[in-house]
Curated annotation (Swiss-Prot):
<keyword id="KW-0632">Potassium channel impairing toxin</keyword>
<keyword id="KW-0800">Toxin</keyword>
<keyword id="KW-0528">Neurotoxin</keyword>
<dbReference type="GO" id="GO:0015459">
    <property type="term" value="F:potassium channel regulator activity"/>
</dbReference>
<dbReference type="GO" id="GO:0005576">
    <property type="term" value="C:extracellular region"/>
</dbReference>
<feature type="disulfide bond">
    <location>
        <begin position="3"/>
        <end position="22"/>
    </location>
</feature>
<keyword id="KW-0872">Ion channel impairing toxin</keyword>
<comment type="function">
    <text>Inhibits acetylcholinesterase. Has been described to inhibit both the slowly and the rapidly inactivating phases of potassium efflux.</text>
</comment>
<protein>
    <recommendedName>
        <fullName>Dendrotoxin A</fullName>
    </recommendedName>
</protein>
<dbReference type="GO" id="GO:0090729">
    <property type="term" value="F:toxin activity"/>
</dbReference>
<keyword id="KW-0964">Secreted</keyword>
<keyword id="KW-1015">Disulfide bond</keyword>
<dbReference type="InterPro" id="IPR045860">
    <property type="entry name" value="Snake_toxin-like_sf"/>
</dbReference>
<comment type="similarity">
    <text>Belongs to the three-finger toxin family. Short-chain subfamily. Acn-esterase inhibitor sub-subfamily.</text>
</comment>
């Protein structure tokens, strides 16, 4: 599962991975 957010792509990735779990990781691992 690709769970990584940067800026605008984060939204696209988060939706594919799950805004809940991904969002948390993205904040810790930008």
């Amino acid at each position: 599962t690709m769970c990584y957010s940067h800026t605008t792509t984060s939204r696209a990735i988060l939706t594919n991975c799950g805004e809940n779990s991904c969002y948390r990781k993205s904040r810790v691992h930008p």
